[in-house]
Amino acid sequence: MSFAEKITGLLARPNQQDPIGPEQPWYLKYGSRLLGIVAAFFAILFGLWNVFSILTLNVSCLVAGIIQMVAGFVVMLLEAPCCFVCFEQVNVIADKVDSKPLYFRAGLYIAMAIPPIILCFGLASLFGSGLILGTGVVYGMMALGKKASADDMRAAAQQTFGGNTPAQTNDRAGIVNNAQPFSFTGAVGTDSNV
């Protein structure tokens, strides 16, 4: 058993279908899940740190810390439902979100990560929610899909709109017909030398 198979076996849930699809590489599928788990852990940890800002009577950082901790728990619930074995409905919720398109998860993570950063801009909220934001960006990139092959992009670039005439690739083809080249030999005869 290779190292990659061991890692994928650790991160896969039992009886899990492949919601992302076979077109994504294994390191992107499981790397995004691992990034989400790490992001959730640090969001909970730094959210707790922000909650302790109540000692300095900073209410906005208290609210940001609570939101960040809730976001961390939601991300942990969706990425690693095995951490919440005491709740019966966790697998149902995680399976429901897994059945949705990837851009749904990306939007959810990005929307949960932005308010703590806005409410209390500091290293704790920036790092904790920034990791969740990064996880949302990775899921968004996975939702966009992979880039087309070079031949497909070349064919799309050579298509012309409005006819079957091929595009001009001549070096002398210009935007303006009968345009004269620039000349730096002297001043124009009507120049007033002002």
Swiss-Prot record:
For this record, the Gene Ontology CC terms, alphabetical, are: cell projection; endosome; presynaptic membrane; synaptic vesicle membrane
Q: Where does the record place the site Calcium ion selectivity?
A: 79
Keyword check for DNA-binding: no
Q: Where is the protein found, in the record's own terms?
A: Cell membrane; Cytoplasmic vesicle, Secretory vesicle, Synaptic vesicle membrane; Presynaptic cell membrane; Endosome
The alphabetical list of record keywords is: Calcium, Calcium channel, Calcium transport, Cell membrane, Cell projection, Cytoplasmic vesicle, Endocytosis, Endosome, Ion channel, Ion transport, Membrane, Synapse, Transmembrane, Transmembrane helix, Transport
* Segments passing through the bilayer: 34-54, 59-79, 107-127
Database matches in PANTHER family: CALCIUM CHANNEL FLOWER HOMOLOG (PTHR13314:SF2)
Q: Briefly, what is this protein's role?
A: Transmembrane protein which mediates synaptic endocytosis, fitness-based cell culling, neuronal culling, morphogen gradient scaling, and calcium transport. Regulates synaptic endocytosis and hence couples exo- with endocytosis. Controls two major modes of synaptic vesicle (SV) endocytosis in the synaptic boutons of neuromuscular junctions (NMJs); Ca(2+) channel-independent Clathrin-mediated endocytosis (CME) in response to mild stimulation, and Ca(2+) channel-dependent activity-dependent bulk endocytosis (ADBE) in response to strong stimulation.
Protein name, UniProt field: Calcium channel flower
Species name: Drosophila erecta
Instruction: State the gene name recorded for this protein.
Output: flower
